[in-house]
């Protein structure tokens, strides 16, 4: 977030705040009463940027995935809800501002220099850049695995995570269709990497590993920004319903096929990027062609006379 503000302050925000809160009215080229280090200005800037950024990423990549990857025949599945796409979009867009408010303290701590993010690659060298990327992915994967799995505990599930499982056969538009607290809690492993040890220890989430991690893993700030954005995109892509199976990468990567099975069977494939945590803790279920929800969708389409036995569209004569 500090990278974004450093870019946008001289480009747009300085002029915007000078217009809204001029230090001296009726003078040419006024400055703002709130300088760049003003905490109120930083709070407003962060909230505006996270709202615009999260919404733009969601709408752009969900649309790409929905129109170019998602198999629209899945919308005929018996468990696909009436007006589901509209509901998914509405749920996602309504959750984003609340998730942004909840994550505000961590972004604010980062902007105000309370993080372990560093500026130059030369500060720690290229080898650490690679190592920190691997550690970041591994840490987030195990953190989200256990947060996600705990959210499926009966005492928690119905209050926080159930809204996301309303979509048995999700589309990419369901990627952010969370209860806001659900989205926030699952984002904590990403945020914790950038917090200083003191700030991390004060966090409410009772996961000691998050506090320990920041003692050993500084991260280059541009790398963090890229990985953080990539995580949001990945969250969308794993909801595309693609049940490709038999590829050697499925042994290691928590693919859209794995996440499709999670939505269908609830207690499998809790991981975010990789399958190792599910495999080790006994919750892994490998994708199989027979488990593809498209089979049930095609049954409905055949009954309606929309496709033949091979799943090919039936062309009706003109005028019918």
Swiss-Prot record:
Cellular component GO terms held in the UniProt record: endoplasmic reticulum membrane; membrane
Molecular-function annotations in GO: C-5 sterol desaturase activity; iron ion binding
BP term (GO), one: sterol biosynthetic process
Keyword Aminoacyl-tRNA synthetase: no
Residue numbers covered by motif Histidine box-2: 161-165
EC id: 1.14.19.-
Transmembrane segments: 43-63, 91-111, 127-147, 224-244
Matching InterPro entries: Fatty_acid_hydroxylase, Sterol_Desaturase_Related
Bridged cysteine pairs (disulfide): none
Stored Pfam families: FA_hydroxylase
Broad class of where this protein is predominantly found: endoplasmic reticulum
Short motif Histidine box-3, span: 259-263
Keyword Oxidoreductase among record annotations: yes
Domain spans labelled Fatty acid hydroxylase: 134-283
Motif interval(s): Histidine box-1: 148-152
Domain of life: Eukaryota
Biological role: Delta(7)-sterol 5(6)-desaturase; part of the third module of ergosterol biosynthesis pathway that includes the late steps of the pathway. Erg3C is a minor delta(7)-sterol 5(6)-desaturase within the ergosterol pathway, erg3B being the major one. The third module or late pathway involves the ergosterol synthesis itself through consecutive reactions that mainly occur in the endoplasmic reticulum (ER) membrane. Firstly, the squalene synthase erg9 catalyzes the condensation of 2 farnesyl pyrophosphate moieties to form squalene, which is the precursor of all steroids.
Domain comment, as recorded: The histidine box domains may contain the active site and/or be involved in metal ion binding.
Miscellaneous note of the record: In Aspergillus, the biosynthesis pathway of the sterol precursors leading to the prevalent sterol ergosterol differs from yeast. The ring system of lanosterol in S.cerevisiae is firstly demethylised in three enzymatic steps leading to the intermediate zymosterol and secondly a methyl group is added to zymosterol by the sterol 24-C-methyltransferase to form fecosterol. In Aspergillus, lanosterol is firstly transmethylated by the sterol 24-C-methyltransferase leading to the intermediate eburicol and secondly demethylated in three steps to form fecosterol.
Record protein name field: Delta(7)-sterol 5(6)-desaturase erg3C
Gene responsible for this protein: erg3C
């Amino acid at each position: 977030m500090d990278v974004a503000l450093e870019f946008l302050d001289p480009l747009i925000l300085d002029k915007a705040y000078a217009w809204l809160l001029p230090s001296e009215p009726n003078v040419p080229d006024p400055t703002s009463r709130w300088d760049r280090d003003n905490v109120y200005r930083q709070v407003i800037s962060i909230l505006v940027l996270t709202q615009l950024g999260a919404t733009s990423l969601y709408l752009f990549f969900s649309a790409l995935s929905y129109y170019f990857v998602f198999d629209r025949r899945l919308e005929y599945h018996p468990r696909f809800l009436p007006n589901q796409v509209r509901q998914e979009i509405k749920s996602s867009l309504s959750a984003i501002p609340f998730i942004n408010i909840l994550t505000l303290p961590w972004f604010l701590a980062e902007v105000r220099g309370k993080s372990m993010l560093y500026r130059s690659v030369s500060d720690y060298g290229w080898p650490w850049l690679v190592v920190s990327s691997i550690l970041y992915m591994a840490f987030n994967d195990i953190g989200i695995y256990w947060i996600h799995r705990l959210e499926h505990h009966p005492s928690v599930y119905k209050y926080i995570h159930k809204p996301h499982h309303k979509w048995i056969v999700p589309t990419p538009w369901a990627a952010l269709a969370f209860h806001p607290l659900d989205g926030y809690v699952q984002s904590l492993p990403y945020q914790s990497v950038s917090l200083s040890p003191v700030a991390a220890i004060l966090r409410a989430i009772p996961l000691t590993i998050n506090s320990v991690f920041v003692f050993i893993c500084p991260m280059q700030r541009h790398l963090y920004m890229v990985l953080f954005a990539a995580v949001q995109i990945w969250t969308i892509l794993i909801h595309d319903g693609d049940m490709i199976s038999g590829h050697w990468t499925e042994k290691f990567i928590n693919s859209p096929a794995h996440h499709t099975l999670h939505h269908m069977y609830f207690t499998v494939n809790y991981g975010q990027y990789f399958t190792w945590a599910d495999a080790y803790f006994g919750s892994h279920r490998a994708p199989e062609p027979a488990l593809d929800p498209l089979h049930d969708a095609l049954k409905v389409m055949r009954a309606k006379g929309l496709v033949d036995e091979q799943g090919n569209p039936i062309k009706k004569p003109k005028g019918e």
